[in-house]
């Protein structure tokens, strides 16, 4: 018994001794080797021991992988042969690799695989064939790989897949078919993948997603279909994907979507639909998706949207409706229910106006971008009760004026971008400028807003305007410039008229009428006549009083003279 134990110990020590490492290799770990350079066709000449468990070969010269390259390596578990310009593989090359669990043949020039090349590797769990030149695959190529979990076939030239190609891969969890030339996926192709969690099909040429294709993928959590040629998606195509968390459909040719398409994917946390020529959305498209945090609908042909389009997306934090050149109107209440929304991007569209309640209920909103639209005015209460709002972008619109209190109730506001608008710097804008005078730090200095009119102030920035003299005083006179179309809008009835203006005069001007001044001229003439009459009366009275005084003085002198003569 003791002799057996000692013999085993000696044998293990002998096995632990490092083998002679080839010159072009590194052998820093026992049972593992890393080699570069040399020729693919002469791997056997490296003299690698047969008891290795890990082999990494890379950057080798172009050639054919020989059938005896790995002879006798029955304990090998990881074989990585990448970036080596392998042009072909001889049949039987991997026949001795019965314990192999990972085979990586990434970034080579392989265009064809022999039918039974993988049959002996029944324990294989990971197979990487990406970044090669594969054009087709034999339908029985993966038949013996019952334990395969990860299969990467991306970045090849595959245009067709046999219907039963993956029929034996019941344990598969990751399947990457991205960046190929696939135009169609046959029915039944994914019928056995009940444990599949990640399916990557992006950057192909798929034209449709047929009904039933994904029916057995109940464990799927990630499905990527972006950058294909999809023109249609079958109704209910995603109904069985109850665990799906990521779905990307951006960069396709979708002009419409079936009603209720996303009704049953309630666990989605990421959904992309941008860069599709969508012309409309169905009234009901989304189900309850409390976990969806981000949604982008930019680059479409949408003209408007259903009022309740986003009503079920209560957990949404970022919503992007940008670069839609035909989007000219938003329905009232469109964003109602998005109580968690932080970022709202509605820029680079064709919006000319916004509903008064467009942002109502978005108490957590921090950033709103409305730049690059055609907005001519903003509702006075648009930003009311948005106590968390930090940034407002309004540059590149057609705004001429803003209500004086449009940003008044935003305690967290730190940035307002107003550049590239045709601002009309008359008295109609003065209330807003008065507010802005106390909040100049909000304006961006890179592209400051400039006056487009009137002519006397054209090209002046708001900074320059506010640093000059008070050109629209509130205590005297009428505006120094003739009233313009913008200034002739009727004042808000809830506001009291400015003390420097007659309310009747403001109403006449608001109606475009010239005030009748004849009454004032008549009154002025009457006042002059009255003044002249009073002045004449005073002069006449003064003359009479002077004559009276002279008479009294004369009589007094006569009385004194008579008294003296009697004595």
Curated annotation (Swiss-Prot):
Q: Where is this region: Disordered?
A: 474-499
Q: Does the keyword Membrane apply?
A: yes
Q: Where is carbohydrate linked to this protein?
A: 51, 181, 243, 298, 312, 385, 498
Q: Identify the residue ranges that face the Cytoplasmic compartment according to the record.
A: 544-567
* GO cellular component term of the entry, any: cell surface
Quote any Pfam family the record assigns: LRR_8
Gene Ontology terms for molecular function: collagen binding
Q: What does this protein do?
A: The GPIb-V-IX complex functions as the vWF receptor and mediates vWF-dependent platelet adhesion to blood vessels. The adhesion of platelets to injured vascular surfaces in the arterial circulation is a critical initiating event in hemostasis.
The name this protein goes by in its record: Platelet glycoprotein V
Q: Which organism is it from?
A: Rattus norvegicus (Rat)
Gene behind this protein: Gp5
């Amino acid at each position: 018994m003791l002799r057996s134990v000692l013999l085993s110990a000696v044998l293990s020590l002998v096995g632990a001794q490092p083998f002679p490492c080839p010159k072009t290799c590194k052998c820093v770990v026992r049972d593992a080797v890393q080699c570069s350079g040399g020729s693919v066709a002469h791997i056997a000449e490296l003299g690698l021991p047969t008891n290795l468990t890990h082999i990494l070969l890379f950057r080798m010269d172009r050639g054919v992988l020989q059938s005896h390259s790995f002879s006798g390596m029955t304990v090998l578990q990881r074989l990585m042969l990448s970036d080596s310009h392998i042009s072909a593989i001889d049949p039987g090359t991997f026949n001795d690799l019965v314990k192999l669990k990972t085979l990586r043949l990434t970034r080579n020039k392989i265009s064809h695989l022999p039918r039974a090349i993988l049959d002996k590797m029944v324990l294989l769990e990971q197979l990487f064939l990406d970044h090669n030149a594969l054009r087709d695959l034999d339908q029985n190529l993966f038949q013996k790989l019952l334990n395969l979990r990860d299969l990467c076939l991306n970045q090849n030239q595959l245009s067709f897949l046999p219907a039963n190609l993956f029929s034996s891969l019941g344990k598969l969890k990751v399947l990457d078919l991205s960046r190929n030339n696939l135009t169609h996926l046959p029915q039944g192709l994914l019928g056995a993948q009940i444990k599949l969690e990640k399916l990557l099909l992006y950057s192909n040429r798929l034209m449709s997603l047929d009904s039933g294709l994904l029916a057995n993928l109940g464990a799927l959590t990630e499905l990527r279909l972006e950058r294909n040629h999809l023109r249609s998606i079958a109704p209910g195509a995603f109904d069985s994907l109850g665990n799906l968390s990521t779905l990307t459909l951006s960069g396709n040719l979708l002009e419409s979507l079936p009603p209720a398409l996303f009704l049953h994917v309630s666990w989605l946390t990421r959904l992309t639909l941008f860069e599709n020529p969508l012309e409309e959305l169905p009234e009901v498209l989304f189900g309850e998706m409390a976990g969806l945090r981000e949604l982008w609908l930019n680059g479409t042909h949408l003209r408007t949207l259903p009022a309740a389009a986003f009503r079920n997306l209560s957990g949404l934090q970022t919503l992007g409706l940008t670069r839609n050149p035909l989007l000219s109107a938003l329905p009232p209440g469109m964003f109602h229910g998005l109580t968690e929304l932080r970022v709202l991007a509605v820029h680079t569209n064709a919006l000319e106006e916004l509903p008064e309640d467009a942002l109502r209920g978005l108490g957590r909103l921090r950033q709103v971008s409305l730049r690059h639209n055609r907005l001519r005015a903003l509702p006075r209460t648009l930003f009311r009760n948005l106590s968390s709002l930090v940034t407002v972008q309004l540059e590149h619109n057609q705004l001429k004026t803003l209500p004086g209190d449009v940003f008044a109730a935003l305690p967290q506001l730190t940035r307002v971008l107003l550049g590239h608008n045709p601002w009309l710097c008359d008295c109609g804008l003065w209330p807003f400028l008065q507010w802005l005078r106390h909040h100049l730090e909000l304006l961006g200095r890179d592209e400051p807003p400039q006056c487009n009119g009137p002519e006397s102030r054209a090209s002046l920035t708001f900074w320059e305007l506010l640093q000059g003299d008070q050109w629209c005083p509130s205590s005297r006179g009428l505006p120094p410039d003739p009233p313009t179309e913008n200034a002739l809008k009727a004042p808000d009835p809830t506001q009291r008229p400015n003390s420097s203006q007659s309310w009747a005069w403001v109403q006449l001007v608001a109606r475009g009428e010239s005030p009748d001044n004849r009454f004032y001229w008549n009154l002025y003439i009457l006042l002059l006549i009255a003044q002249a009459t009073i002045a004449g009366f005073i002069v006449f009275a003064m003359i009479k009083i002077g004559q009276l005084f002279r008479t009294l003085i004369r009589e007094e002198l006569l009385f004194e003279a008579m008294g003296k003569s009697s004595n």
